From Swiss-Prot:
Gene3D superfamilies on file: Acyl-CoA dehydrogenase/oxidase, N-terminal domain, Butyryl-CoA Dehydrogenase, subunit A, domain 2, Butyryl-CoA Dehydrogenase, subunit A, domain 3
Record note on quaternary structure: Homodimer. Homodimerizes after import into the mitochondrion.
Name of this protein: Very long-chain specific acyl-CoA dehydrogenase, mitochondrial
Region (Membrane-anchoring): 484-517
EC assignment: 1.3.8.9
Active-site residues (renumbered): 463
Amino acid sequence: MQSARMTPSVGRQLLRLGARSSRSTTVLQGQPRPISAQRLYAREATQAVLDKPETLSSDASTREKPARAESKSFAVGMFKGQLTIDQVFPYPSVLSEEQAQFLKELVGPVARFFEEVNDPAKNDALEKVEDDTLQGLKELGAFGLQVPSELGGLGLSNTQYARLAEIVGMHDLGVSVTLGAHQSIGFKGILLYGTKAQREKYLPRVASGQALAAFCLTEPSSGSDVASIRSSAIPSPCGKYYTLNGSKIWISNGGLADIFTVFAKTPIKDAATGAVKEKITAFVVERSFGGVTHGLPEKKMGIKASNTSEVYFDGVKVPSENVLGEVGDGFKVAVNILNNGRFGMAATLAGTMKSLIAKAVDHATNRTQFGDKIHNFGVIQEKLARMAILQYVTESMAYMLSANMDQGFKDFQIEAAISKIFCSEAAWKVADECIQIMGGMGFMKEPGVERVLRDIRIFRIFEGANDILRLFVALQGCMDKGKELTGLGNALKNPFGNVGLLMGEAGKQLRRRTGIGSGLSLSGIVHPELSRSGELAVQALDQFATVVEAKLVKHKKGIVNEQFLLQRLADGAIDLYAMVVVLSRASRSLSEGYPTAQHEKMLCDSWCIEAATRIRENMASLQSSPQHQELFRNFRSISKAMVENGGLVTGNPLGI
């Protein structure tokens, strides 16, 4: 596991990029190796903006500036104590009649293919996807789901894509990773940044499956710290090509791909100073260029059917026209590629959970113990109910995000990170409980649950390790709140010119701190039958925002070092966003009279009751509990002693 530390320069790069993509095109969940750009968001990712500018004069604070569009992100708003509902209410429905019909025509054949042709157990045993399966997927168009139709793809929207990702996730995560590594990250850069010539040259080949693609970022010396990449691409004196040298590790499809998105350092001369600096540039590299080789497939715990290997570049001549994006903009390209595929994992794992729950229910329905079917026992009932709730939340997040992207919203990076954290942890819990319900049978190889458990484990690591993504969620949210606090500080320099702003903020804080509440409400937004859960969500938002502000005021820019605190703020944010998402979906079901509406109401209410309790207790302890501060100090001291001792400090109680 990589360290959460990052250099200040990388943190500032992320701030300049805004940690978001300006494009909303996303494809099937793509699984990079166990590192990701999201790991880059740790530690100092918000330091620059949480610093109040020292040189800002009172005149400057009131100077007219170009208006910045107010974010419509619910997640951004909740850190500020705002109820921003544009992206979450009502639950979005974005497919046109034509898109819905096309999707229906795809769902049947894809589902039948995975039921009748693909053999996940055999793929796992062979440690490769069978050739017949790959050929069948090519014929289905599965290698170019979001490539424009005029370039040989299916041209699917994000929501259409999510539905197919769910089907793949129900059946075989090894195949899912193979497809995702190809199109979600492998050639995604060409979709996002490719020139007309690059798109016309490469997209038809990758869409047909004639050529597989891979994403080459990670190196032995660079995990979280992309700036430490050693691969180099030196321009030729004539300027017609670059000579690429270096190696990449843990590359999905590395041994199969013919087209690679590769990141390497290039020397760039500063026009102003004449100094030469190394900056990362992205390239489209073909195996046919020569000098591209790969190692043996890695032996892995799970997703064995997917190919993972090292890739080597030895004196590869890359034409200058194969630069992806601008020279020196490789960091931006990498971040945006990775940020654009996050929702698909939620859709995929929603499907995985659906299949696991079906196995658990089947076993509970038919298994008799102590003279009764085990589904009649309270312990089993609670397990099944919790599994269903986790799947419902995950599925609701997946289709909320895909719809937001299809609607053209740009600000969803916190929500996307939340969905990745939630779905990967929920899927692990569901798989674990499925085995528990099935007992010894679940531990056996034949039912296939043990394979799914092995496959699921990686999802908490790649696409951004969840520990690091939690820091990103908290820091990104605090960054936006920090900007607001800086604005209030500037307003105080000219109080008579900002009376309305200051009075409004003072009133809001007073209401929160006296327990009256902010006056926010979801009344008239959520369905009346969900009004109690809506009130719980608003109360939770008030409690959460109060703590965020208090901790920012206390720690200021130093909050980037308070990882114990940040993790718990992130947990609150995850719970709160999940509450709002299921409130939105269940409200739609009740309003439109869906047959499952009352069942969805129970799922929603159950989640909201427990999530609100967690938020209330966690925020209260962060706000005033000396025991928590003692706990954090103990964690530091225990860990330090273990590192100094090379392991456990305590000995065996027998003393032998």
